[in-house]
Amino acid sequence: MTRKVPNIEQMSQIECGLCCCLSILHFYKSKETLLDLRRDIEKGRDGYSIGDLKQLLNKRNFDTGSYQVKDVNKISELPLPLIAFWDNQHYVVIYKVKKNKVYIMDPSKGYINYEF
C-alpha cells in the first residue's frame, strides 16, 4: 500500500509550490514548517518557479530533477512522490498511480484523484 503524503493547505494563492515542498519534506519525516521554508526563499510576484522549488529541496539534500511528461501513462515510471506543475498554473504532489488513476495532494483542494 502506498503511503499518502501529508495534506498541507495553502494559505495564499501563490504558495502551492511551497506547500508541495513541505508535504514532500514531511513525507520523509522533516519537522520543518511553512514559516521555515518562507524564510529560506524569496517569493516572486507570481509565486515560486520550478527552479526555486528545486533549490529549496536541494538545500535539504534532496536529489531533484525536472521532467516533461506528455503521456500520463509515463508518470508511473517516475519516482513518487513528485511535485507536478498542473495545468500550467498550479503545483500538486502526485503520490500514487494505480491502474487508470493518478492520486494527488492539491494544496488548494486536499486529496483527489483523476482517471486517465
Label for each model-derived stretch:
Residues M1-F116:
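Conserved active-site-adjacent core of cysteine acyl-enzyme catalytic domains
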